[in-house]
Amino acid sequence: MHDMGHAPGMSMQDMANDMRNRFLVALLFAIPVFLYSPMGKMFGDFATPFGMDRNLFLFIVATGAIAYPGWPFFVAGWRAARNKVANMATLVVLSVGTGYVFSLGATFFYEGEVFYEAASVLLVFILLGHWLEMRARAGASDAIRALMDLAPPMATVIRDGREIEV
């Protein structure tokens, strides 16, 4: 799992907790991104704080929803690209990154629709799935460790009619 940008030596439980925290941060930022996006207008047309341009506000909040929470995927995606392989992180970086970079262009360089909410909400669902996977792996690791602890340190084996401890 260290290829996902986690620090070497992190336990599975620590990695699961890290993914939970990243999921919660992404969710916290993705809610306003969704509500202020064109798609969120079905829930009401909210005025942006401080009279900010809507796309600029979405850029700022979406950056919070994507930068820190998605960092392990960006690190793993970079490593995969450097090694000329494709993996799950490559898919995540391409999908989230494409929506974010296109929206960044539409915010600052050309006229167009922004898709910050798509990139943010997609990352929220990816992080939720990754967190649940890490929790399951941590639980399985703990169960295997508990089973290994049940095994006695020494065993008696009969070889050539003699009892030998191994």
For the regions a protein language model found, what residue spans apply to each?
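General structural signal for secondary-structure boundaries
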Residues: 1, 50, 165-166
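Histidine-centered metal-binding segments
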Residues: 1-15
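Intrinsic disorder/low-complexity detector
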Residues: 4-5, 55, 89, 162
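Intrinsic structural disorder/low-complexity segments
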Residues: 5, 9, 41-42, 133, ...
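Transmembrane helix-loop-helix hairpins at the membrane interface
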Residues: 13-154
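Cytosolic catalytic regions of P-type ion-transporting ATPases
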Residues: 156-166
